C-alpha cells in the first residue's frame, strides 16, 4: 500500500511540480496553500507524511505543524523550504519535524527525506554539514520553549504584525476587533519585555514565525 502525502506551499506552481515528482512513489492526497488549510486537510485526511514550506500566509508552516502535533495527529512532517537557515532547522526539529530539506535540492534528496520520515528517521539537507543531523535530532527531543511562551492567538497576531499588516488588517484576518488585536500585541510586548514593534519583528524571526534568509544560488 502506497504512503499518503499531503503537500503545503503558497506557491501553486511548486506544489504542482512536487506532486508530479512524489506521485511516482506515493499517493498525493491534497495540497494546501496556507497553514489553516493545512490543519483542516491534515485532520480530515490523516496523511502518513506532510511536506510543508515554513513561509506561508495567514498561518506559517511551523505553527501549523505545532498545532497538529498538539492535536495528536500521528503524521510525519518534512519541511521543504528555500531557507538555508540553521536556526529555522533547529526550530523545525524541535517543533516535531522529521526532515528539513531545501527546494533547490535534488529530487532524490526530497524522496530520501520522505522515506526517512516514513521509517522513523531524521533527515537534514546535504547543504548543511553532515554532523549537524545528530545535533538536530537531539534538539527534537527538547520542548519548544520559545513557542510555548505565547498562546496560539498571540502567535497568529505576531506573525501578521511581522508580515507588515496594520492592526486593523490583523483584526480583519482573525475576525476580532482592532482593540482586541491591539491588546494581544500589548500583552505580548509586556510579557516578553519588548518595547518596540521592530523588536517584536526580530523576535518573530528568531522563533521562526517568519524567515528572512533565502538561499541564493552561487554566482
Role assignments for model-derived ranges:
Residues 12-30:
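Two-component/phosphorelay signaling modules centered on CheY-like receiver
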Residues 34-37, 58-63, 84:
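Acidic catalytic/metal-coordinating carboxylates
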Residues 40, 62-74:
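Short amphipathic alpha-helix used as the core "switch/output" element in two-component signaling
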Residues 45-51:
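Active-site beta3 strand of CheY-like receiver
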Residues 53, 81:
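Active-site residues of response regulator receiver
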Residues 87-94, 98-152, 156, 206-212:
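Short, flexible helix-to-coil linker/hinge segments that flank and couple to helix-turn-helix
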Residues 186-219:
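Basic, Lys/Arg-enriched C-terminal extension of HTH/homeodomain DNA-binding domains
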Amino acid at each position: 500500500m502506497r504512503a499518503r502525502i499531503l503537500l503545503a506551499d503558497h506557491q501553486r506552481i511548486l506544489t504542482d511540480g512536487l506532486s508530479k515528482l512524489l506521485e511516482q512513489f506515493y499517493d498525493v492526497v491534497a495540497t494546501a496553500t496556507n497553514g489553516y488549510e493545512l490543519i483542516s486537510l491534515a485532520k480530515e485526511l490523516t496523511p502518513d507524511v506532510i511536506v510543508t514550506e515554513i513561509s506561508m500566509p495567514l498561518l506559517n508552516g511551523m505553527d501549523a505543524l505545532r498545532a497538529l502535533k498538539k492535536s495528536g495527529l500521528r503524521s510525519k512532517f518534512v519541511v521543504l523550504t528555500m531557507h538555508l537557515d540553521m536556526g529555522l532547522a533547529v526550530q523545525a526539529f524541535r517543533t516535531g519535524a522529521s526532515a528539513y530539506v531545501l527546494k533547490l535540492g535534488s529530487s532524490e534528496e526530497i524522496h530520501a527525506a520522505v522515506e526517512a520520515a516514513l521509517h522513523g528517521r531524521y533527515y537534514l539537507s546535504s547543504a548543511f554539514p553532515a554532523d549537524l543531523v545528530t545535533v538536530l535530532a537531539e534538539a527534537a527531543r527538547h520542548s519548544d520553549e520559545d513557542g510555548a511562551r505565547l498562546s496560539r492567538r498571540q502567535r497568529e497576531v505576531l506573525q501578521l504584525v511581522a508580515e507588515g499588516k496594520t492592526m486593523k488588517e490583523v483584526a480583519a484576518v482573525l475576525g476580532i476587533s482592532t482593540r482586541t488585536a491591539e491588546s494581544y500585541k500589548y500583552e505580548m510586548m509586556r510579557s516578553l519585555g519588548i518595547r518596540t514593534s521592530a523588536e517584536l519583528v526580530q523576535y518573530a524571526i528568531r522563533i521562526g514565525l517568519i524567515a528572512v534568509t533565502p538561499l541564493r544560488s552561487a554566482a
